Amino acid sequence: MMKSDGNCQFRALADQLYQNSDCHELVRQEIVKQNMSLSTNSQWGDEVTLRVAADVYQVKIILITSIKLIPFMEFLPKSQKEPDKVIHMSYLAGIHFNSIYKKNKEKGSRSSSSSSSAVWMKLQRKKENEAKKKEEEEKERKDMEKEEKKKDKEDKKKDKEDKKKAKVQKEKKEKKEKKNRNHHFHYSE
């Protein structure tokens, strides 16, 4: 039974494709490449996402529904050839997807657990790379802030020096003018 967390369709697809419903984020990411509106986790999947999933993974998806008028639906990839893999899912009461298997076939026998482990490792590496990238971006942002503060400090220092120079020049000018006035006054006596 898939968790009812808004990711049930992607969990069911991950379970069918990789025998690991925890790979639902990877499945979502692959489908999102085709349909950007689904990038938010817990955004419900629908018929469109099943069509995209059939295309992305080149599989036939058979969806058993609880709808009397439509007991099942098939989703095929756009390619003309018949897909090698068929996956089965259920859609209950119009609100929840599950991964289902034929009774005589055990879940683990569908493929080796090593492929599931490889997918899990790929997902973990991707998460680690994203975290590392985020960390690098944060460091770069902090370095830029530090550089801006340093530049601001230098600019303030330069402004202070410029004001000091302007004050000295003004004082010199005033002194010179005063001297000229005194000198002029001296001659008029």
Curated annotation (Swiss-Prot):
Gene3D superfamilies, A to Z: 3.90.70.80
Annotated GO MF terms: cysteine-type deubiquitinase activity
Biased composition (Basic and acidic residues): 126-174
PROSITE patterns in the record: OTU
GO CC terms: nucleus
Residue ranges the record marks as coiled coil: 120-181
EC number of this enzyme: 3.4.19.12
Active site: D5, C8 (nucleophile), H96
Record's keyword terms, sorted: Coiled coil, Hydrolase, Nucleus, Ubl conjugation pathway
Region (Disordered): 105-189
InterPro entries: OTU_dom (IPR003323), Papain-like_cys_pep_sf (IPR038765), Peptidase_C85-like (IPR050704)
Localization, UniProt: Nucleus
Transmembrane segments: none
Top-rank EC class of the record's enzyme: hydrolase
Motif Nuclear localization signal 2 per UniProt: ranges: 163-170
Catalytic activity: Thiol-dependent hydrolysis of ester, thioester, amide, peptide and isopeptide bonds formed by the C-terminal Gly of ubiquitin (a 76-residue protein attached to proteins as an intracellular targeting signal)
Motif stretch (Nuclear localization signal 1): 125-132
PANTHER family linked: OTU DOMAIN CONTAINING PROTEIN, OVARIAN TUMOR DOMAIN-CONTAINING DEUBIQUITINATING ENZYME 10-RELATED
Function: Hydrolase that can remove conjugated ubiquitin from proteins in vitro and may therefore play an important regulatory role at the level of protein turnover by preventing degradation.
Protein name, UniProt field: Putative OVARIAN TUMOR DOMAIN-containing deubiquitinating enzyme 8
